[in-house]
Amino acid sequence: MSGLTHFDAAGHAHMVDVGDKQETRRIAIARGTIRMLPATFALIRDGKARKGDVLGVARIAAIQGAKRTADLIPLCHPLALTRVAVEFELDDALPGVHCVVQVETFGRTGVEMEALTAVQVGLLTVYDMCKAVDRGMVITDVSVREKRGGKSGDWKAEDAAG
């Protein structure tokens, strides 16, 4: 099946066996953005959203998302995460919010899925908390920006084509 590791020779989905892989420090950084109306951005920036501290709640949700990734992605290994750091960057020019998540573990498989899930859950929480005033918000540009560790080595998005 041409390099797709989640399928066996017969084409059936399976969880990849990582038992023989060496344990190493694994780090992944993912990023995403939510665009919104200027008035919605002002509510978040000024801490005046009716549901409370939007970014504070979204930060906790993102951490929870990283921890629950294996429950959501069927073939993803459950991992003992050693660190999840969530940062939000307010962007007046957009207007919107960028979410950057760094996830770390010491194990046999990477944490890219945990970082991506954390970004999505954090941004979905922003949407949920602000949808009463702005149903047109758009979550966009969610991607892995960097990964470190493991057999395949280090990688940065700027190293990729496209």
Curated annotation (Swiss-Prot):
Name the catalytic site residues. D128
One record GO biological process: Mo-molybdopterin cofactor biosynthetic process
Q: Which UniProt keywords apply?
A: Lyase, Molybdenum cofactor biosynthesis
The UniProt entry, under InterPro entries, shows: MoaC, MoaC_bact/euk, MoaC_sf, MoCo_biosynth_MoaA/MoaC, Mopterin_CF_biosynth-C_dom
Q: Where does substrate bind?
A: L75, C76, H77, M113, E114
Report the catalytic activity: (8S)-3',8-cyclo-7,8-dihydroguanosine 5'-triphosphate = cyclic pyranopterin phosphate + diphosphate
At the top of the EC hierarchy, this enzyme's class is lyase
Entry's Gene Ontology molecular function annotations: cyclic pyranopterin monophosphate synthase activity
Question: Pathway, according to UniProt?
Answer: Cofactor biosynthesis; molybdopterin biosynthesis
CDD domains per UniProt: MoaC_PE
Its Enzyme Commission number(s) read 4.6.1.17
Q: Which NCBIfam families match?
A: moaC, PRK09364.1
Similarity-based family: Belongs to the MoaC family.
Q: What does this protein do?
A: Catalyzes the conversion of (8S)-3',8-cyclo-7,8-dihydroguanosine 5'-triphosphate to cyclic pyranopterin monophosphate (cPMP).
Subunit structure, interactors included: Homohexamer; trimer of dimers.
Q: What is this protein called?
A: Cyclic pyranopterin monophosphate synthase
Gene that encodes it: moaC
